[in-house]
Curated annotation (Swiss-Prot):
Record-linked Gene3D superfamilies: Divalent-metal-dependent TIM barrel enzymes
Record GO biological process: base-excision repair
Chain sites annotated for binding Zn(2+) 1: 69, 109, 145
Enzymatic class: hydrolase
Record protein name field: Probable endonuclease 4
Family annotation (Pfam families): AP_endonuc_2
Entry-linked InterPro entries: AP_endonuc_2, AP_endonuc_F2_Zn_BS, Xyl_isomerase-like_sf, Xyl_isomerase-like_TIM-brl
EC number: 3.1.21.2
UniProt similarity note: Belongs to the AP endonuclease 2 family.
Binding site for Zn(2+) 3: 182, 229, 231
Organism, scientific name: Nautilia profundicola (strain ATCC BAA-1463 / DSM 18972 / AmH)
Keywords per UniProt: DNA damage, DNA repair, Endonuclease, Hydrolase, Metal-binding, Nuclease, Zinc
Presence of the UniProt keyword DNA repair in the record: yes
Free-text cofactor note: Binds 3 Zn(2+) ions.
Length: 281
């Protein structure tokens, strides 16, 4: 069983994300629990929280199939302490929101060194802040996302994720999300069966499938190993459709959210149907 959906809008209240997921025939989804381009947001209302939980139950969604994403502003590895602290406080707020909604995961981009400190120093700061955040919150698993390596973003090598995980004290609360467009742009090929197996074996050896808590399912406008982050609709980009068949037929990827962040929301329902059609081939 795979939880297939898209990153749906929660505009007008988090409960609307559930309705939007239902509308596209999803059995999993991603959402922002607040405006992703603002540092501070009003707390979630009791009414919104209850309605969200009610709709989740009514439509048969479970927490295992939902992958909330934090704000793009947050940088846990920021070289400047005051800005890092601002990011940390926003991150903890995001985790608490997820926990209020009864969800399990918070997906986030590891962080950026902004060309002011070394990669290792930045990875140490990220690890330190994750450890702090785990102590300051209750139970949610914090899910590091693979990145394309654009600019000074870390997370474009499996080794970056492994380094962070190694430094986490409570490993039951850390995980990883593979974004297909990002890994492809970072130089991990998945276009043929052989390339896919090689990349997944590398992931397993360096990070470990036990840490895989979700995937972002995207084709790529950017060329292989370009270190450029540009998503495309399935089969229309540089990756091609076969990679998504391999994913849907891979039992190591069962029971986690597979979330579309492709560029044409109007065809998400079709893309979900397409992915599900690959599952039992």
């Amino acid at each position: 069983m795979k939880y297939v959906g898209a990153h749906v809008s929660a505009s007008g209240g988090v409960e609307n994300a559930v309705k939007n997921a239902v509308d596209i025939g999803a059995n999993g989804f991603a959402l922002f629990t607040k405006n992703q381009r603002q540092w501070v947001a009003k707390p979630l209302s009791e009414k919104s929280i209850n309605k969200f939980k009610e709709l989740m139950e009514e439509h048969g969604f479970i927490a295992d199939g939902v992958l909330p994403h934090d704000s793009y502003l947050i940088n846990l590895g920021h070289p400047e302490e005051d800005k890092r602290e601002k990011s940390y406080n926003a991150f903890v707020d995001e985790i608490r929101r997820v926990e209020q909604l009864g969800l399990k995961y918070l997906n986030f981009h590891p962080g950026s060194h902004l060309k002011k400190i070394s990669e290792e120093e930045c990875l140490d700061l990220i690890s330190e802040n994750i450890n702090r955040a785990i102590k300051d919150t209750e139970y949610a698993t914090l899910v590091l996302e693979t990145t394309a390596g654009q600019g000074s973003n870390l997370g474009y090598k499996f080794e970056h994720l492994a380094y962070i995980i190694d430094n986490i004290e409570d490993k039951s609360r850390i995980g990883v999300c593979i974004d297909t467009a990002h890994i492809f742009a970072a130089g991990y090929d998945i276009r043929t069966k052989e390339a896919y197996e090689k990349t997944m074996q590398e992931f397993d050896e360096i990070v470990g499938f036990k840490y895989l808590k979700g995937m972002h399912i995207n084709d790529s406008k950017a060329k292989f190993a370009s270190r450029v982050d540009r998503h495309h609709s399935l089969g229309k980009g540089e990756i091609g459709i076969d990679a998504f068949k391999f994913i849907m037929q891979d039992s190591r990827i069962d029971n986690i959210p597979l979330v579309l962040e492709t560029i044409e929301p109007e065809i998400w329902a079709d893309e979900i149907k397409l992915l599900k059609s690959f599952e039992n081939v």
